Amino acid sequence: MSRPPPTGKMPGAPEAAPGDGAGAGRQRKLEALIRDPRSPINVESLLDGLNSLVLDLDFPALRKNKNIDNFLNRYEKIVKKIRGLQMKAEDYDVVKVIGRGAFGEVQLVRHKASQKVYAMKLLSKFEMIKRSDSAFFWEERDIMAFANSPWVVQLFCAFQDDRYLYMVMEYMPGGDLVNLMSNYDVPEKWAKFYTAEVVLALDAIHSMGLIHRDVKPDNMLLDKHGHLKLADFGTCMKMDETGMVHCDTAVGTPDYISPEVLKSQGGDGYYGRECDWWSVGVFLFEMLVGDTPFYADSLVGTYSKIMDHKNSLCFPEDTEISKHAKNLICAFLTDREVRLGRNGVEEIKQHPFFKNDQWNWDNIRETAAPVVPELSSDIDSSNFDDIEDDKGDVETFPIPKAFVGNQLPFIGFTYFRENLLLSDSPPCRENDAIQTRKSEESQEIQKKLYALEEHLSSEVQAKEELEQKCKSINTRLEKTAKELEEEITLRKSVESTLRQLEREKALLQHKNAEYQRKADHEADKKRNLENDVNSLKDQLEDLKKRNQSSQISTEKVNQLQKQLDEANALLRTESDTAARLRKTQAESSKQIQQLESNNRDLQDKNCLLETAKLKLEKEFINLQSALESERRDRTHGSEIINDLQGRISGLEEDLKTGKALLAKVELEKRQLQEKLTDLEKEKSNMEIDMTYQLKVIQQSLEQEEAEHKTTKARLADKNKIYESIEEAKSEAMKEMEKKLLEERSLKQKVENLLLEAEKRCSILDCDLKQSQQKLNELLKQKDVLNEDVRNLTLKIEQETQKRCLMQNDLKMQTQQVNTLKMSEKQIKQENNHLMEMKMNLEKQNTELRKERQDADGQMKELQDQLEAEQYFSTLYKTQVRELKEENEEKTKLCKELQQKKQDLQDERDSLAAQLEITLTKADSEQLARSIAEEQYSDLEKEKIMKELEIKEMMARHKQELTEKDTTIASLEETNRTLTSDVANLANEKEELNNKLKDSQEQLSKLKDEEMSAAAIKAQFEKQLLNERTLKTQAVNKLAEIMNRKEPVKRGSDTDVRRKEKENRKLHMELKSEREKLTQQMIKYQKELNEMQAQIAEESQIRIELQMTLDSKDSDIEQLRSQLQALHIGMDSSSIGSGPGDAEPDDGFPESRLEGWLSLPVRNNTKKFGWVKKYVIVSSKKILFYDSEQDKEQSNPYMVLDIDKLFHVRPVTQTDVYRADAKEIPRIFQILYANEGESKKEPEFPVEPVGEKSNYICHKGHEFIPTLYHFPTNCEACMKPLWHMFKPPPALECRRCHIKCHKDHMDKKEEIIAPCKVYYDISSAKNLLLLANSTEEQQKWVSRLVKKIPKKPPAPDPFARSSPRTSMKIQQNQSIRRPSRQLAPNKPS
C-alpha cells in the first residue's frame, strides 16, 4: 500500500524568515500606501491621527478612564515633540490681513527661513464644526494640491493646530477682478482676454472631473504678470460618469447662480458643467456694462429675475457692445439645453467674439496681459482692500465632559508639496547583504555617470550659447541694414514730397498775389461806387428840396429809382465778388501756412533722419568690427570646441563601452542567479522525491521481510504436522521465492536510482561551485570595471584640468601672438579700413552723383517756375490794362448813376423811418426787460426779507419763551406779531394756490391745444392716406392704360403724346402735393414738440411750486403748534404750572418728527453707500432736504404724502443682503404709493415690477420660492428658516414679505396668515432709510407706524409724478427696484 505525500515540511529543512516571500510584498505595498501623498493613511495622516487623538483625549474628565490615561502617559510627550518639529504658524511673519470671511481670514506672510512671500488662509475649526459643515475645505485642498495647472492657485503646504487649519498658497499680488473692474472701465478688448482665460481655467477644472459652481470675479485672481487664476474651490463637486451632478441645495452667489441650480432647491437638482458657463456669461456682461444682468436689492428680486431671464435680460442703450459680445452673452445666459459649452469647450473657442490678432488659445498665457500690476516690492498689497482688525474674541471648543472628537474631521489635512519624510529610505529592503552592496555600488556608478552627463551638457550649453550669440549678432546686422535701407527710402520720399510742396507753395503764392490784386481793385471800385452813391444821394436831396412844390418830377424820380436799383444790384454783385475774393484769399493764405508748416515738419524730419542715418552708419561700422572679432573668437572657439568634442566623444565611447560591459555583467549575473535558483529548486525537489521514494521502498521491504519470517516460522512448526501437504504446497513456495527475487531486483533498481540521484547531486554541486566561481570572477570583473570607471573619471578630471590649463596657455599664447603680431593685424585692419573707406567713398560718390542729378532736376524745375512766373507777370500786365479799361467804363456808369439821386433819396428816407421804428421797438423791449429784472430782484429781496423776518421772529420767539415768566405783555405783543405773520403766510399760501390754479388752467389749455394739434395731425394723416390711395389708384390706372392692348388702326401718335403730357402733369401735381404735405408735417411736428416742451416746463414749475407749498405748510403747522404751546404756556403760567409740559417723553412734539436719516446710493454691485438727508415728518407730509440751508430756503429734495403710506418696518439681512451687517439693526423701510411722491427727477429709470407668471398665489400672497443662507426664522412656526450650506426650501411674499417654510404650503397647513397688503404692487414703491442708532430706528418706526392710514387710499390716476430735474441729485440714488418689496412690520 502507498501513503499520500506529507503536507508539512521535513524536520531537517530550514524555516523561512517572516519578512521573506509574500510577507515582504505586503510590507512593500503598505510602505507604498504610507508614502503616497494621495493615500488616506500617508505619513502626515498618521501623525495627524495621533495628534488629534491626544488633543481630543487630553481633558480632566476623560483622564479618569484608566485606558485613556495610560495612552496619554505613553504618547503625550512624543506628540508634543512631533508638534514642535512640524510646521507651525510661528514659522511665518504676518505682513498684512488681505481678506476675511465667515470661517477665517487670509494673511500675507513671509516665511522666516526662506524669506519667500505666500498667502496663508486660516480656517477656524470651531466655526466649521458649529455650522455643521467641515467638509468643504477638502475639495479646495485637493484641487490646489494636485491640480498642477497654471490656471489654478497652487498650494505649497497645509498644516493645523488645535484651533485653525492653515493653507499656504501662492500670493497673487494683482488682486481680484472686482478690484480691476472698480479701478478701470473695462473695454471689450480686455473683456475678451479675461473671458478667454476664465474659459481655459474652467476647462482645466472640468477636465479634472469637477464643477466649480461659484464662478465670480471675487474668485478670479491676477498674478504679478496680470494673468488670471481661479481660487476658492469650496463649492466644487465631483461629476458622475455622465458628467452630471446630483444636488438638492442651491450653491453659489445670488447674482451669478444659474436657473437649473436655483431649481435644485426643490429636490430635483440634476445639472452639469453648463452651470459654470452661465456664470461666465454674467461675468462678461458685468465687465462690459459695469453691473450684473439680474441685479436686485433683495434675494427674492434677484432670483425671480434669473428664473425669468428670457424677459429680464436686456442690454443698456448707453453702453456700446458689439454684436458678437451680445451673441456670446445671450448664448451663455439661456436654458441649459441650448447653452453654449454644453457639448464641450471647443464650441466656445470657435465663437467669433474671441477672434483677434494678438493671441490664440495656445499662447494666451505667454502674451502680455492688458493690465500688468505695478508692484513696489514682493509684499505690495495695494490691489487688495484694507481690512479692519478683528477685535472680537476668538471662540474655541468648550471643555467636554465626554469624548466629542472635535479634531477627528481634520485628520489627514496636513500636506507638503516637497515632502522630506521617508524620502531617503529605499523602496524595498532585501535581507541579502550582497544585493545591498551591489545596489550601493550601482548607485555610485550612476551618480558618476550623472556627473559626467551634466559636465557634457554644460559643455554643449556653452557651445549653444556661443552659436546663439553669433546668430543674434547676425540678426542685429541684418536689422540695421534693413533699417538703413528704409531710412534711405524714407529720405527720398520726403525729399520728393518737399519738392512737390515747394511747387504748390509757389503756385499758391502766385494765386494769392492775384487774388490780393483783384480784391484791392474791387475794393477801390466799391469805394468809388459808394462815393458816387453818396453824391447821388446828395443830389437827390437837393432835387427833393427844389421839386417839393412840383408834381411833374415824379417820372424823373421813378427813373432815378430804377437807376438806383440797378446801381444797388451792381453794388451787391461787386460786394459778393469782393467777399468771394476775400474768402479765396483767406483760404489760399491758410493753405500757404499749412504748406509752410508741412515744409518745416518735413525739414525737421529730414534732419532727424540724417542724424539717425549717421548713428546707424556708426553702429553699422561698430557692429562690423564686433562681428569680425566675434568671427575670430568663433573660429578660435570652434577649434577649441572641436578639440573638446573629440575628447568628449572619446570619453563618451569609453562611457558607452563601460556601460555596455556593465550591462553585460549585470545580464550574466542575472542569468547566473536565475540558473542558481532553478538548480537549487531542482535539487530540493529531487531530494524530497528521492527521500520520499526511499522511505516508501524501505517500508515495503521491511513489511515483506517480516511477512517472510512469519511464514518461515509457521512452515517450520507445521512441517511435522503437515508433511503430507508439503508436496501440494511446493508450488506456493516457489511462487514465494519468485516474489522474493522480484523484491530483491526492485531493491537493486532503487539502489541504482539512489546512486544516479547522488551522482546528479554531485554534478549539481560542481555546477554550483562553478557558478560561484564565475560569480566571483564577474564580481572581480565588476571591480575592475569600477576601477576603469574611476580611472576614466580621473582621466576626465585630468582632461578638464588640462583643458583649463590649455585654455590658460591659449589665452597667454593669444596675448603673446596679439602683442607679437600687432603690426600685422594693424596693417590688415588698416587695409580693411582702407577698403571700407574706398567702398564708402564709392557709395558717397554715387550718392553725390544722384544728388547732383536731383539738383539738376531741381534747377530745371526752378527754371520752369521762373518761366511760369514771367508768363504770369505778362498775364498780370494784360489784366491790369483790362482792369483800367473796365474802370473807365465804370466811371461812365457812375456819371449816369448821378442822375438817379431822387429815387435813392426816397429809399433812404423809407429806410430811416424803418430804422427808427426798429429802434423804438428795441428800446421798449429793453425797458420791459429792465422792468422785469427789477421786479424779479424786488421779489427776491422781498423773499429774503421775509425769510430774515421769519428767522428774527423765531429768535424772538425763543427769547420770549425763556422770558415768559417776566413779562406777559411782551408775550401778547409777540402773539400779535405771530398772528399777523400767520395771516401773511396764509395770504402767501392763497397766492401760491392761485398761481397753482393758474398753472393748472394753463396746463389744461396746453392739453386742449395738444388735443387740437393731435386732431389736426389725424386730419393730415387722413389726407395723406387719401393722397396715397389716390396715388395708388392713379398708378394702377396708368399701369392699366400702359398694359391695355389697343388695335393699331385706332391708335395714333397724337393720343399717345396727349396721354404722356397728362401723365407728366399728374406727376408734377403729385410732387407738389407731397412737398406741401411734408412741409405741413414738419410744421405741425415742430408745434407739437414745442407744446410738449411747454407742458414739461409747466409741470416742472407746478411740482416745484407744490413742493415749496408743502414745505410752507409744514412751517405754518410748526408755527401754529408753537402758538398753541404759547397759549397753553400763558394759561399754565396764570395757573402756576411749570414750563415744557406740552412735549411728550421722546423729546419731539407729537405732531412733528425731524432729524438726520441716510438714503441708499448704489456705488457698486457689492455694497450699499449712504447719503445723509434732513427729514421732517409733519401731520400730512414727509419732507426730505439735502441740507439745513435747503430747509431754511423751503427747497425739499423729495416729499412723500403720509396718506399714501402703506407700511413701515425694520429690515432683516435677507432684505438687504448687500448692506453691511453692522448697519442692518439701524435700517428700516417705508412702502408708499407711487403717486404719493414728489421728487427731483433721478438720473436713471425705475425698473418696472415683473409679471405674476412665476408666483404662487395663496391667501392674497404672491409667494416666490427661495433659500436663505443668512439667519432668518419662519414667521408661521418661528423655527429657523436658514442654513449656511443646506437651507430648507422657503417661500417669501413679494407683497408683504412674510417668510415661511415651503412645507406649510405643500401640506396645506392653516398656519400662514392672509396677506396684509391690499395695494396694487405695480403702483407701489419702497424706500430704505438708515438711522444713526438702533434706538432712533425704533423711534422712527414706532412714530411712522402710528401715522399710517388704516385703509390705504386708491391710487389717483391724475396724481403727480416728479419729472423735475436738478443738478443737486445724487447719482445712483437707490429709490429703484420696485420688485424688492419688504415684509410688514412684525408686531412688537
From Swiss-Prot:
Residues 92-354 form the Protein kinase domain. Highly expressed in brain, heart, lung, liver, stomach, spleen, kidney, testis, muscle, embryo and placenta. Isoform 2 is expressed predominantly in the skeletal muscle. Its cofactor is Mg(2+). The lineage of its organism: Eukaryota, Metazoa, Chordata, Craniata, Vertebrata. Residues 357-425 form the AGC-kinase C-terminal domain. It catalyses: L-seryl-[protein] + ATP = O-phospho-L-seryl-[protein] + ADP + H(+); L-threonyl-[protein] + ATP = O-phospho-L-threonyl-[protein] + ADP + H(+). This is Rho-associated protein kinase 2. A zinc finger (Phorbol-ester/DAG-type) spans 1260-1315. Its EC number is 2.7.11.1. Homodimer. Interacts with IRS1. Interacts with RAF1. Interacts with RHOA (activated by GTP), RHOB and RHOC. Interacts with PPP1R12A. Interacts with EP300. Interacts with CHORDC1. Interacts with BRCA2. Interacts with NPM1; this interaction enhances ROCK2 activity. Interacts with SORL1. Interacts with PJVK. Residues 1-26, 512-532, 1345-1388 are annotated as: Disordered.
